[in-house]
A protein has these predicted regions:
Chain A
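Short, highly selective alpha-helical patches that border small-molecule cofactor pockets
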Residues: 177-182, 280
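Intrinsic-disorder-associated, low-complexity terminal segments enriched in Asp/Asn/His/Tyr and depleted
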Residues: 20-22
């Protein structure tokens, strides 16, 4: 439980222990990569990470497919397979025996079919994606969002995200994971989170009916609230914002003769395919200035949060993400064969795996594509760069509405 | 490889994102274009007021003289372009290669743009109805008849979200610089050549570079230009027009539905006007909003349609560098196929006949691996009811519609250019009063034969300036 010992907020420890699950079954959660001693021999680190992933995979499959701990959904699904997950999954690559996960399975109820028996009775959340029209996709969560963001916390530099300082969360709340997750991150680091909500479903509706002025007015309404909070003396030093909202906030502050830096913010994380190398550079050089740290993240409700490779001028603003292995894995696969990895530097579609006690996803085809990247010392497994909407969907996808 | 930067108030900017612009036939990358992002535009527009300040250091007359010089440079000089240079022949070649417009049409568009620049002073005199230019510069002044007038600039810059495939639209923004208003251009992804060449020509003619921004980029760039410029023009389809309808900040240019109307007094002589009709439909490959998409008459419509079909139906695509090439290619994948399918569907309606098919050796749609052609199509409609009677496509296409003269004005709907062949004073008066016709030609004028001293889709002076009251002394006692 090393993640807890790093917290500067003792009451959180208590909460986490109370919420800890299944005391009789130990799932080894290997330390997040940043906690690993830097091993000079990258290939050794890669092998070690691979071994951990294999072990974690087996353990996760055992949990989800064992009649005493598995979820009704997977136990039912297993009956349709021509293989036995309990005996025939011996490493991560064996997950390819599963048919691809269909995200349509996440639409509709009952949501309880996703709760593993081993976690029955725990307080559960539902987070949703999509949902502008029709039934949204739902994911049941108990504590994954906390764990994901605690792990992410360990990658944040304290000098830019000072522990004990307060946060601004500028993005969607409602049925999304973000608000609760960022709020937990703030609390985990000993701070309090101030939240400004944005309803992306409403923005999509406005844009679809061509009401650009309405969407702009709504964005202004959101930004005005953020400006007010920042001016209210709450000692806010850290922020999460979507790229569009951060941009609007920074420009609004400039219009008022001040800036993100002058408002006291020293560290920001933002995410999504709109966080492009050009936008990264624009942020550092013009929008925020050199004294405000910004780091990209990539993730979704299903996967958790992938971290950006630490900024290095030599990268020329290339953004490379690494999944929080072994809890989640990102593969970059061929467009015409989703079981085949592309070569390093080559372009492919993003395939996600989620391997936590709460959720098992053996290969979900994300709506993004990118280039496969080599492992990094800090993250000794494959990364992905240049994430952008999958070209076959790009023209029909509304991106970056918030 | 030609590398084309973003231009931020005259300064080249290298982006982290570059997009190749490719030859429509071969897919070969012809240039790498640096891509702006929306935030960067919003950031730059915070300094927009400077552009007008800089331009007001010159008189409008001086700027008009610079336009004359720029016209010559644009038409004849070898000018810098990104990390290379470009002469006029190279300009036409690359514009043709990315837009699918034959080289001879690119050259014709060049001459048209240059003409407008050369005659800028007359154009402005016409559009301002002889207003002394210093009134626009100072915001107010005394007219020669002793009346105080005031024209207040409504913006420091004009934003333009330009189309990808239509090099003919650039004349619209050329008067902006001499009107002492800066230019913020978001070029179309396939037709950035005119904006960049014109920028360089203006700069070399003495216009300070600091009054220009050129932002090649994605949709967010167009959005940022539209959001931050107090006055903007955008080009698009009916949906775009609808979106900006009633927004005083925006002039939206879309389909023209331009038409030729033959009055009952002249329709019996229709054969005399076949050249005028064919040229209105066909020139510039029918790609302009000012190209005629309809010929309306109360009688002889079948014969008119047949004559037009006989003239245009056999015309086939030729290589882009063939001086006789007259058909432009469709370079957007699937567009021609979809249009063709839509036409076939609309032809199924009773009373609609395609007349050109019998004069064409082969199909209307000629698909290639990376591009397509649609061959000229003439349709006859026995009434104005079928949807195809009032349709416009980006190729030489026209419906010849039978309609009684007394119903014509009502039935033609919105019409950008209406060429009306009549000498009937009563009908002429009705045509003059018809508010659904924007540019009215009464007489033998092709729909695409624009006089540059006339306003186009609204007077740009009225768009950029507002006439208002100004007094610096009390009025006479009354």
């Amino acid at each position: 439980m090393s993640r807890i010992s790093k917290s500067k907020a003792p009451w959180i420890i208590e909460k986490r222990c109370l919420a800890d699950y299944h005391p009789t079954t130990t799932i080894t959660c290997p330390p997040f990569a940043s906690e690993s001693p830097v091993v000079s021999n990258l290939s050794e680190s890669v092998s070690s990470a691979k071994a951990k992933l294999d072990a974690h995979t087996v353990e996760t499959v055992q949990w989800h497919f064992h009649p005493s701990t598995g979820s009704p959904f997977w136990l039912e699904k297993a009956k349709t397979y021509k293989f036995d997950p309990l005996t025939e999954v011996k490493c991560f690559d064996d997950l390819k025996k599963f048919p691809h996960f269909e995200d349509e399975w996440l639409r509709g109820g009952p949501i309880s079919r996703w709760i593993p028996k081993g976690l029955a009775g725990k307080p559960a959340y539902v987070f949703e994606t999509g949902g502008t029209t029709g039934i949204p996709k739902s994911r049941m969560v108990i504590e994954d969002h906390w764990i994901d963001y605690e792990n992410f916390s360990d990658t944040l530099p304290d000098e830019s995200f000072p522990r004990g300082s307060n946060w601004l969360m500028l993005g969607p709340s409602g049925p999304r994971r973000l608000r609760l997750a960022v709020e937990h991150l703030a609390q985990y680091r000993g701070g309090i989170c101030f939240c400004v909500d944005l309803d992306p479903r409403w923005v999509v509706k406005l844009l679809k009916k061509g009401d650009v002025a309405g969407a702009k007015a709504y964005a202004d309404h959101v930004i005005d609230q953020a400006v007010t909070i920042l001016s209210a003396g709450h000692d806010i030093k850290c922020a999460f914002a979507t790229p569009k909202l951060l941009e609007a906030l920074a420009l609004k502050l400039m219009d008022k003769g001040t800036s993100i830096e002058e408002s006291g913010i020293t560290g920001i994380f933002a995410g999504g395919t709109e966080f492009t190398p050009q936008w990264y550079r624009f942020c550092r050089e013009e929008l925020l200035g050199p004294n405000v740290y910004i780091t990209p993240t990539y993730g979704n409700t299903l996967m958790g949060l992938a971290c950006g490779k630490p900024f290095d001028p030599a990268d020329n603003y290339k953004i490379t993400y690494f999944a929080p292995q072994p809890r989640a894995v990102i593969e970059t696969v061929e467009f015409n064969d989703y079981d085949q990895l592309v070569g390093y530097g080559k372009t492919g579609r993003v395939k996600l795996y989620t391997l936590t006690k709460e959720l098992f996803i053996p290969g979900f085809m994300e709506r993004d594509e990118g280039e496969r990247e080599l492992p990094h010392e800090k993250y000794p497994w494959d990364g992905i760069s240049g994430t952008r909407p999958f070209h076959e969907f790009a023209s029909t996808t509304t991106v970056g509405v918030y | 490889m030609l590398e084309i930067p973003v231009i931020r108030w005259g300064k080249p900017y290298e982006s982290m994102e570059k997009t190749p612009v490719v030859h429509f036939e071969t897919g070969e990358a012809l240039a790498n274009v640096n891509q702006a992002n929306g935030g960067l535009i919003k950031m730059d527009m915070r300094k927009a007021a400077k552009a007008r300040e800089i331009l007001r250091q010159f008189t409008i007359e001086q700027l008009c003289e610079m336009c004359v010089k720029a016209a010559d440079l644009y038409l004849n000089a070898t000018l810098p372009l990104g990390n290379g240079t470009q002469n006029p022949q190279e300009f036409c070649r690359i514009q043709s290669a990315t837009t699918g417009l034959p080289e001879n049409m690119c050259a014709a568009n060049m001459r048209k743009n240059a003409y407008v620049l050369q005659h800028m002073k007359e154009v402005l005199e016409a559009l301002t109805r002889g207003l002394p230019f210093d009134i626009l510069t100072n915001g107010y002044g005394m007219e020669s008849r002793g009346i105080m007038v005031s024209y207040q600039a409504q913006t420091s810059v004009l934003g333009m979200v330009l189309p990808s495939n239509s090099p003919g639209v650039h004349t619209l923004w050329m008067p902006v610089i001499p009107l002492q208003i800066g230019l913020v251009l978001k070029p179309g992804s396939q037709e950035l050549w005119t904006p960049y060449r014109m920028y360089e020509a203006f700069a070399q003619a003495g216009v300070p570079r600091e009054v220009f921004c050129l932002y090649p980029g994605g949709f967010d760039c167009g959005g940022a230009v539209m959001e931050t410029c107090e006055r903007a023009m955008i080009f698009g389809g009916a949906q775009t027009i609808e979106r900006y309808h009633g927004d005083p900040r925006v002039q939206a240019h879309g389909p023209g539905f331009s038409k030729i109307l033959l009055g009952d007094d002249m329709v019996d002589d229709w054969e005399k006007y076949i050249d005028l009709m064919a040229d209105s439909i066909f020139l510039n490959s029918g790609r302009s909003c000012i190209s005629a998409s309809g010929v309306w008459a109360s009688r002889h419509t079948e014969a008119i349609a047949d004559a037009l079909a006989k003239r245009l139906g056999p015309i086939a695509p030729r290589p882009m560098n063939d001086p006789a090439a007259s058909l432009a290619a469709f370079t957007v994948p699937g567009a021609a196929k979809a249009i063709n399918a839509q036409i076939e569907e609309l032809l199924k309606v009773p009373g609609v006949t395609e007349v050109s098919a019998k004069y064409r050796d082969g199909d209307r749609h000629i698909p290639h691996e990376r591009y397509d052609f649609l061959r000229p199509t003439i349709v006859h409609c026995t009434s104005s009811e079928p949807a195809i009677a009032n349709t416009e496509y980006m190729f030489p296409f026209a419906s010849v519609v039978q309609c009684p003269q007394n119903e014509m004005i009502k039935k033609i709907g919105s019409t950008l250019v209406g060429t009306c062949l009549t000498k009937d004073p009563k009908w002429s008066r009705e045509l003059v009063d018809a508010t659904n016709i924007d540019r009215l030609n009464i007489g033998e004028v092709r729909t695409n034969q624009l006089h540059w001293m006339q306003p186009h889709e609204g007077n740009i002076i009225d768009f950029l300036f507002r006439a208002r009251a100004f007094q610096n002394s009390p009025p006479p006692a009354h």
